[in-house]
């Protein structure tokens, strides 16, 4: 029996939707909940799933058609009904009887765990990374030929126009062949690597040994040297530093060491877990070797760039203290002593000495003049003595690739004027992908179109003004630092500042219902909402989205933290549902993520307010205790509140902000952490 697929209700007050793209065609077989098409409204862009399993018999609305909610857009039936495209109209009235058998048929057992690869190599294909995504660009291989991988262990990083993600291994085994290089753009379904067992690795490994003549001596002795960009540590220990983990992040807290002194590690094998106020992440080993010293303990907060460990070989473990005494002298033997490297690699340096470029034939330590390079490319450049400032990248957006470094090392790209001073443009917060936008005119996406329309409209129909309060976050910062490890262990989510802001704002909205309100100019009525449905602004590659935490007044801080992470993740991966973007009564936007101290956020009616949270910065402040003034270093933040004067008066806005300020400065959140 055929089933009519109707345009669903995609949010409050939404009466129609525009079909932007059909993901299936007539004759295609679909499963229950498999995406059929993409629909756009003035509130959301979303995929419409199939309500039943079967074959698409007829499509009744074309792309770019605007269809009323409840309008029939397609007919789905059985395969033997395909020729009878005229029949579905009579069969549509009885969907209830169809749904039971239809939903029972397609149910499939969960896919069994991927088996280990056998001697016959298993193909690793470029996966489908989203609807309408047909290709992906390999940004970095995390493994090399000869490496052993487990099921679901990350193999490589891939970038598309919708998402950057890691691709896991479908099987356990040994990588016997890599068929696509970094920066290659590969079609979905194309084979990018092969995984087999150790025996299967023997033959392909020899085939891959030929591309770069310089790498042959390295690959002949240990098979671990498949990734020449990251050399193994030698007898002289290599410093492991606290990396820069985001813009404006100056320090990180070590939450857990995953390795101990004496442990052997491979390149990119996780060493420790680090937490900042923006991210929790694992820090990989920059070299292969043995951990000879750990210089920072768990729960220590360490500045970016500080040495936290040292890695050498087994011999280096015996006397790490002696190696520390002369780090400058160690660096020379590291490059000259390794037996794995033939003298052949020192010759290019001598030749370079006869050219103007030789004066700068070392890697720029800061890399500020370089558009963008991966850590592996930077290590390769250091190994071959190539100054990245003199290399012209051939990758996307001028990105320097491995091939560019090798070409420069071979003297293929060494112009006489390379040593000339280069303008030190900043690369902080620069997305090299955006370089291709220069000099072009492009149609905006749906999110940008809606944002442009709604923000201009909001300024025309509401009386917006902004009030700014300053809040001392020192006590919250101390409470957060003290409880972060226990919070992560118990609740499985990082404790950032945002849940504290959300908790304080939600409580203030309950206490000040005149701010959690909406004004109807036509009926001259004010609605005071019973629930606090808090919109959270999320920066996504496609643009700004504001998903909603419904009934936020009923949530604890752990529940708020989990809701924020969930909504942000689904926003960036195009997984939001229509209800996630509707019903908001107030908005919070984190304007401080890139260091902004303040802003004037734009509210979108029917909401009456939006609160910005600026960057939390340490600065000297006059404080008064027991009637005595003193100057102290405090962690301060600005909270700009934009509100609609049709709904809220200035004095009421001030009282609302004062309530938030008092809650945050008092910082009595211990009971709210549920530890």
Curated annotation (Swiss-Prot):
Task: Give the EC class as a word.
Answer: transferase
Q: Effect of gene disruption?
A: Cells lacking this gene display no ODH and no PDH activities.
What is the scientific name of the source organism?
Answer: Corynebacterium glutamicum (strain ATCC 13032 / DSM 20300 / JCM 1318 / BCRC 11384 / CCUG 27702 / LMG 3730 / NBRC 12168 / NCIMB 10025 / NRRL B-2784 / 534)
Q: What is its EC number?
A: 2.3.1.12
Question: Record keywords: Electron transport included?
Answer: no
- List, alphabetically, the InterPro entries matched: 2-oxoA_DH_lipoyl-BS, 2-oxoacid_DH_actylTfrase, 2-oxoacid_DH_E2_comp, 2-oxoglutarate_DH_E2, Biotin_lipoyl, CAT-like_dom_sf, E3-bd_dom_sf, PSBD
Chain intervals with Basic and acidic residues compositional bias = 335-352
An example Gene Ontology cellular component term from the record?
A: cytoplasm
A molecular-function term among this protein's GO annotations:
lipoic acid binding
Show the active-site residues.
645, 649
Protein name as it appears in the record? Dihydrolipoyllysine-residue acetyltransferase component of pyruvate dehydrogenase complex
Q: Quick one: which gene encodes this?
A: aceF
Query: What's the effect of swapping residue 162 to Q?
Result: No effect on ODH and PDH activity. Strong reduction in the catalytic efficiency of ODH and slight reduction in that of PDH
Task: List required co-factors.
Answer: (R)-lipoate
Query: Which ranges are annotated Acidic residues under compositional bias?
Result: 205-218, 321-334
Q: Which family does it belong to?
A: Belongs to the 2-oxoacid dehydrogenase family.
NCBIfam families named in the record: PRK11854.1 (NF008814), SucB_Actino (TIGR02927)
Keywords, in A-Z order: Acyltransferase, Lipoyl, Repeat, Transferase
Q: What else is known?
A: Is the only lipoylated protein in C.glutamicum.
Q: Which reaction does it catalyse?
A: N(6)-[(R)-dihydrolipoyl]-L-lysyl-[protein] + acetyl-CoA = N(6)-[(R)-S(8)-acetyldihydrolipoyl]-L-lysyl-[protein] + CoA
């Amino acid at each position: 029996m055929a089933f009519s697929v109707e345009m669903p209700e995609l949010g409050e007050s939404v009466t129609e939707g525009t079909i932007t793209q059909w993901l299936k065609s007539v004759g295609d077989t679909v499963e229950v909940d498999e995406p059929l098409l993409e629909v756009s409204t003035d509130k959301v862009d979303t995929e419409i799933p199939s309500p039943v399993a079967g074959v698409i018999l007829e499509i009744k609305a074309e792309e770019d058609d605007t269809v009323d909610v409840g309008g029939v857009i397609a007919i789905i039936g059985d395969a033997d009904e395909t020729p009878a495209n005229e029949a579905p109209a009579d069969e549509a009235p009885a969907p209830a009887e169809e749904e039971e058998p239809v939903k029972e048929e397609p149910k499939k057992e969960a896919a069994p765990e991927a088996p280990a690869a056998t001697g016959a190599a298993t193909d690793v294909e470029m996966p489908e990374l989203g609807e309408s995504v047909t290709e992906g660009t390999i940004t970095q291989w995390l493994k090399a030929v000869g490496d052993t991988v487990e099921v679901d262990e990350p193999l490589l990083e891939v970038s598309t126009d919708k998402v950057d993600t890691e691709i896991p291994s479908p099987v356990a085994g040994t990588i016997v062949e890599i068929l696509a290089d970094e920066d290659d753009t590969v079609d979905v379904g194309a084979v990018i690597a092969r995984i087999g067992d150790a025996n299967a690795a023997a033959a392909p490994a020899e085939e891959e040994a030929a591309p770069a003549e310089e790498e042959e001596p390295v690959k002949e002795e240990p098979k671990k040297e498949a990734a020449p960009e990251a050399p193994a540590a030698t007898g002289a220990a290599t410093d492991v530093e606290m990396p820069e983990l985001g813009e404006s992040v100056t320090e990180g807290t070590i939450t857990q060491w995953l390795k101990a002194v004496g442990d052997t590690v491979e390149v990119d094998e996780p060493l420790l877990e680090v937490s900042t106020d923006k991210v929790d992440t694992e820090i990989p080993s920059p070299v292969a070797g043995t951990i000879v010293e750990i210089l920072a303990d768990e729960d220590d907060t360490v500045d970016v760039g500080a040495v936290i460990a040292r890695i050498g070989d087994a011999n280096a473990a015996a006397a790490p203290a002696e190696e520390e005494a002369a780090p400058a002298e160690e660096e020379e033997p590291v490059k000259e002593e390794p037996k794995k490297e033939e003298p052949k690699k020192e010759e290019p340096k001598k030749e370079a000495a006869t050219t103007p470029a030789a004066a700068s034939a070392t890697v720029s330590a800061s890399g500020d003049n370089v558009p963008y390079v991966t850590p592996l490319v930077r290590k390769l450049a250091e190994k071959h003595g190539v100054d990245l400032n003199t290399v012209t990248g051939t990758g996307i957006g001028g990105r320097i690739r491995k091939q560019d470094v090798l070409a420069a090392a071979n003297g293929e790209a060494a112009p006489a004027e390379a040593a000339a001073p280069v303008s030190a443009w900043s690369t902080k917060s620069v997305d090299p992908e955006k370089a291709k936008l220069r000099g072009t005119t492009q149609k905006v996406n749906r999110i940008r179109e809606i944002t442009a329309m709604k923000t201009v409209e909001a300024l025309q129909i509401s009386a917006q003004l902004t009030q700014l309060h300053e809040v001392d976050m020192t006590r919250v910062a101390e409470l957060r630092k003290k409880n972060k490890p226990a919070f992560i262990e118990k609740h499985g989510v990082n404790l950032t500042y945002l849940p504290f802001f959300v908790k304080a704002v939600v409580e203030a909205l309950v206490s000040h219902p005149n701010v959690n309100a909406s004004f109807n100019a036509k009926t001259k009525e004010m609605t005071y909402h019973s629930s606090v449905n808090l919109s959270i602004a999320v920066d996504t590659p496609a643009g700004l989205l504001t998903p909603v935490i419904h009934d936020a007044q009923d949530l604890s801080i752990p529940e708020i933290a989990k809701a924020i992470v969930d909504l942000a993740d689904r926003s960036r991966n195009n997984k939001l549902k229509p209800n996630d973007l509707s019903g908001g009564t107030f908005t919070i936007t984190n304007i401080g993520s890139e260091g902004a101290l303040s802003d004037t956020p734009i509210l979108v009616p029917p909401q009456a307010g939006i609160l910005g949270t600026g960057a939390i910065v340490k600065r000297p402040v006059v404080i008064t205790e027991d009637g005595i003034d003193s100057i102290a270093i405090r962690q301060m933040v600005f909270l700009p509140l934009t509100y609609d004067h049709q709904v809220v008066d200035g004095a009421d806005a001030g009282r609302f902000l004062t309530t938030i300020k008092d809650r945050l400065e008092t910082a009595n959140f211990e009971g709210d952490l549920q530890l």
